[in-house]
Amino acid sequence: MKVTTIIAALLSVAVVDAQNNAQCRKLGLPCHATKTIPYVVKKGDTLTHIAHDIYKRKVGICDLAYTNHIGYNPDLIYEDQTLLIPTDCKTIDDGSCLKKHVS
């Protein structure tokens, strides 16, 4: 009986997790985020500063760039611009959006 209960609980968690992942993909949110919160850019802000210092590395630079459809210069943001910050990230992406320099 206990094994059946444990298996049922694990299956429920797996189904809910799959539904959440599908919903986030539908919303286009990176890092398996479940929602976003707004952030108004202040003078001198960069995505690096926002991700690392303000949000204490709970979101990645590239997660911010992808969520806000920022192109190949992830630090090209403007004062008073409202960014969406993905929350509850399961993975953090600090590199996939950055240009790779070949020597």
From Swiss-Prot:
State where the protein is found. Secreted; Secreted, Cell wall
Binding-site list for chitin: 44, 48, 75, 77
Annotated TM spans: none
LysM domain boundaries: 37-85
Expression is induced as follows: Expression is up-regulated during wheat colonization.
Tell me the leader sequence span: 1-18
Protein family (similarity comment): Belongs to the secreted LysM effector family.
**Briefly, what is this protein's role?**
Secreted effector that enables the plant pathogenic fungus to manipulate host defenses for successful infection. Binds chitin and suppresses the chitin-induced reactive oxygen species (ROS) burst. Chitin-induced polymerization of homodimers forms a contiguous Mg1LysM highly oligomeric super-complexe that is anchored to the chitin in the fungal cell wall to prevent hydrolysis by host chitinases.
Q: What is this protein called?
A: Secreted LysM effector Mgx1LysM
Instruction: Please state the gene responsible for encoding this protein.
Output: Mgx1LysM
